Amino acid sequence: MGITVLKNEGLDFHARISTPLSEIDDDIQKELLDLTKKVKIAGFRAGKVPVSIVKQKYGTSVRNDVIERRINHSVNHVIKKHNLSIIGRPKIEALQNEPDKALAFTVKIELLPKVTIPDLKKISLDRPKLEVNAKDVEEQLEKLAALTKSYTKESKAKIKDGDQVTIDAIGYIKDEAFEGGQLNDLKVVIGSNALIPSFEKQLIGSKTGSEVDVNVTFPENYHSKDLAGKEARFAVQIKAVHTAEPTVIDDEFAKKFQSNSLEELRTHFAKQIENESEEAINTIMKMNLFDQLEKLLDFDVPASLLEQEKNILKSETDKNNQDESLLKDKSPKEITEYYNKVALRRVRIGLLLAEYAKSKNLQLEPDDLRKVIMQRARNFPGQENMIFDFYKNNPSAIEGLKGPALEDKAVQYIFNNEIKLKEKKYTKEELEKYLEAEEQRITLI
């Protein structure tokens, strides 16, 4: 085997590899001889088929198999000989494969960069800590009470905010009834904003038995394109009005929600508020850590990984319509520069965390994958079971989670063992403002 290194610079390794014709012919002959003992051809006894007949029938496929094995063997030999850390599949170019000539080809291999882990103990970050107070808990209790109001008391008085109204209605555009504009026995709580803007307000002051004309304009983003932005009139008949029975927040109320007492329900809500903030805090902390890591990393990255990450980034942009805000009014050049910068950051940090996990011998446990699946499921409220079933029935999808799961594990290890964390306390209102500002800042990074 002849090996000529054509390029060994940065993350590119190119070599020209050749194998003498005699070695190729020897391999082919050996394969054909082996086949004479195995194949069955009409007119010949088993194991007695002449090589010439086998070659005539199987020669092309045997040669192709031999060439493929030789190429794979040669490439693997080069990788081991030069101790290459490769990424992706080597590319084979300029293949010389004529039957009367030596086998020759050029292999182009993309290399992983040498990643040096910086001194992470020099990094210092603030860690937000939510202090849940009694007011936060009472607000949650009041919201729960509002959601479980009982509307059993019929009212003959004028409709006011908070009443539940039962209506029939027919919608008209330019005095013509439109499809989907008929409402029958619809129950709506005034002030809930369940209907299109201003509809509910125009019912205030009416009584049971009244007929009211309600004039509205459908929002520009209304789900029906035929109605979006159009003015309409609804002829509404008030069929019934019910006022809410006051909800007493006590131990009996708590028992409706699997709590033995009101105090137990309060404790549950306090923990829930804290847990809900933790995921958002962890996401922000992770991005803040990445901000610091980005300043410490300057190694080259494989072009294929960079291109792959840019494509993912563009897909995320399209999916989330971020181009309407973040990239609005940007020139094509500025957008390209933005994609390049963010993709480079992501790839560098991903390679660093992979190297860090390797250096600390971090191994994935089943619970690590379960956490990632739970995080994905929380992004689809009401469809959690569908997400769980998808991953349960698709092992290949689970494979795709191993990278993010190991990255999360490495990040948590860094938080727990490397960097300096300074706890900074926030009230619920303060934390919500902080998280909102941070989420806008870290969009698409």
Swiss-Prot record:
Any one cellular-component term (Gene Ontology) = cytoplasm
- Gene3D superfamilies in the record, alphabetically? 3.10.50.40, Trigger factor ribosome-binding domain, Trigger factor, C-terminal domain
Residue ranges of the PPIase FKBP-type domain? 162-247
Q: Name one GO biological process term.
A: chaperone-mediated protein folding
Which residues does UniProt call coiled coil? Answer: none
* Subcellular location(s) per record: Cytoplasm
Task: State the top-level EC class.
Answer: isomerase
A GO MF annotation of the entry reads:
protein folding chaperone
Keywords from the named record: Cell cycle, Cell division, Chaperone, Cytoplasm, Isomerase, Rotamase
List, alphabetically, the SUPFAM superfamilies matched: FKBP-like, Triger factor/SurA peptide-binding domain-like, Trigger factor ribosome-binding domain
Q: Which PROSITE patterns match?
A: FKBP_PPIASE
Q: What is its EC number?
A: 5.2.1.8
Q: Which family does it belong to?
A: Belongs to the FKBP-type PPIase family. Tig subfamily.
Q: Domain notes, please? A: Consists of 3 domains; the N-terminus binds the ribosome, the middle domain has PPIase activity, while the C-terminus has intrinsic chaperone activity on its own.
Report what the protein is called.
Trigger factor
Where does this protein come from, organism-wise?
A: Rickettsia akari (strain Hartford)
